[in-house]
Structure formats: C-alpha cells, structure tokens
Amino acid sequence: MGRIGVLLLNLGGPDQLEDVRPFLYNLFSDPEIIRLPFTWLQKPLAWLISTTRARKSQQNYRLIGGGSPLRRITEEQGKALQAHLASQGQDIQVYIGMRYWHPFTEEAIAAIKQDGITRLVILPLYPQFSISTSGSSFRLLEDLWQRDPQLQAIDYTVIPSWYDRPGYTQAMAELLREELDHFAEPDRVTIFFSAHGVPLSYVTEAGDPYQAEIEGCTALIMQALNRPNPHVLAYQSRVGPVEWLKPYTEEVIPELASQGVNELVVVPISFISEHIETLQEIDMEYRELAEEAGIEHFRRVPALNTHPLFIADLSQLVLEALQGPSRKFDQVVRPQKQVKLYPQERWEWGMTSAAERWNGRLAMLGFLALLLELITGRGPLHLVGLL
C-alpha cells in the first residue's frame, strides 16, 4: 500500500529577533505578496523593505516574547493530528512546511522523499483560500513537482480550503461562547470578526475567493453560535498605498464606539494559531485603539491552536481526502489575470517598444528614488507607511 503522509502548510515566522529581517526579505520576495511590473525589481525591493521595516518589526516581536510562537504551535498541531490519526488506526506521518521561514517547505519535501512517502495529503493551515497564502505555497510545490521525477511518482491530493468544516466552525463557536459568557449580558455584546486583509485587486481582478469564503465562514460561525449578538466583519494588517478589502479594522473600532458600543469580543477569523497578528496587533494595538475610543470592555477569542474539536475535524478531513478523488495543483484557483499590487494606471503598460524603454527608465528612476529614500529616511513611501 505504501507510506502515507500529510504536509501541513503555513506562513512561518521568525523564531528570534535576529530572524526578523531575513524572514521579511523572504516574505516580500514572493511575487504573490508584492507584484511589480519588472521581476528584476523584486529582490532589491524586498531588501529595501526588509531592511527598513526590520527594526519596527523587531520591536513588535519583542513585545510578544522575542519571536513568533507559530513554529512551536504548528508543530504541536502536527503532533496532535498524527496522534489522533493513530487513534483511528491510521499510520500517517505528518510534516510541517513553512513558506517564509524554517522549517521551509523544501525541507519538508526532502523529508517526505527520504521517508519514501507514496501518498500525500497537502493541507494548508489557512481555513480560507487566497492566492497570497495557500495559493503561494501551491505554486511553490507545483514548481518543485515539475522539476523532480521522484515527486511526480507520489500520489498527492491538495485541500484548497476548509472554512466550512462543521468541526472547525463548532470549535470557533465554542471558544467564542466562552468569551461571551464573561459578560453580564452575553447576548448583547458586539462580536467583531477580524480577518487578515488582501489587496482588493486580488478579489475584483484576479478572482480570489478569499472574501467570499471569509464572509461564508462568518455566517457559519454565527449559525453554530446560535445567539442573537450583533456582529461585524472587518479586515486588518493592511500595508502599502493600494486599496485592500474593506472595512478596515482600525477604522471600524472607533465607528462602533461612536455608535455607543461599549463591549466588544474580537474573533481572529482567519488565524488558527497565535502569532504576531493576534498577540500584538489585536491584543495590543486594537485594544489600545478601542480603549481610547471609549470601549471599556474588550476581549479576544483565543486562536484554535490544538483545540480537540479542531484537531479531530482535521483528522477526518485528511481521511476524507484519502478516500476521495485526487485534486491536483492545476485544479486549484489561479489568478485570472496578472495583478499589480501598486496603484493602477489608466493606460496599458508596454504597448510599444518605445513605451517599454520608457517604462524601464522610469523603473530605474523609481529604484534610485527608493535608495535615496532609504538613505535619507524621507519620502512618499514613508508617508504612506510602506517603509
């Protein structure tokens, strides 16, 4: 029958402060995170952004203990999943593959090959699909498969998303219910679903299903909760000058306060593990914002981590994937068109060779301007918060 494996995919995070800059470099080197008109600009821009943002990011990681807990928690999830599968009589090895830090996806693939895995379930730890998260990891894996005959011999299947799994939504509702019950009148507390944002162009131009899956997930959690609480959905972690999915978390919180909301429970809907976006951005930045706006009671639902219902549902998901038809990389959602993650022009790029030459010259001037801004610490990118 052969050996069976599960590859858990995640973002990755710096284990210590010294890892922050190279982690950011890896992140911004990914064209699914920042798309540029010229690919040769990707690495220089990644170096600029990682160098200029490293100190601020290190300060944020210092506030949560000096590094991201994501690797530790993901490894705990992997061990819990493997143990639950074993309790069902399944001898399945679980591997961890991070996109931007150790253990890298390539390291996991090397272990999978060495262990002689013949059947593989590829399971991203992102409940909702986006071309910038699961899609980026799938693109990397597809490239590895195309270049490696040994990988091509593995019977694999991918799971694009699982936001509508009953065990997942029930586990989220259970944690939410526990937080609501800390209030004197639980049914009157406003529930604030905060999801990681993506550029609007991903959804409107590239066909990313992320927004629809986030909205569907919110509805399913409220259905599982079965309480009459008012609730809102917003998007956090926006960077750069382009428009992202709205409404923005940092704008909605003061709006709620101005409407008289005094009690708020935040649900990190797109995060299944504690990391910088929950521990620092929500717990510190948004809590302070809420208190300054007049919201006196602010609580946050913890991430699922190794919640028993969640792990049991992941285990069942793996077994269903093994029993069903295989799903290949070319069956996963892909961008419908090339999307540039910078302010869009009203005219098309590269209509003539002369235009291409001018585009190249403008790009070089832009790169020199970036270098000048890095040296002086002043410029438009600082004003919009990209640097």
From Swiss-Prot:
Pathway: Porphyrin-containing compound metabolism; protoheme biosynthesis; protoheme from protoporphyrin-IX: step 1/1. Belongs to the ferrochelatase family. Disulfide bonds: none annotated. Its main location: cytoplasm. NCBIfam families: hemH. One of its GO terms (biological process) is heme biosynthetic process. It is found in: Cytoplasm. This is Ferrochelatase. InterPro entries: Ferrochelatase (IPR001015), Ferrochelatase_AS (IPR019772), Ferrochelatase_C (IPR033644), Ferrochelatase_N (IPR033659). Pfam families: Ferrochelatase. GO terms for cellular component: cytoplasm. It is an enzyme of class 4 (lyase). It comes from Cyanothece sp. (strain PCC 7425 / ATCC 29141). Catalyzes the ferrous insertion into protoporphyrin IX.
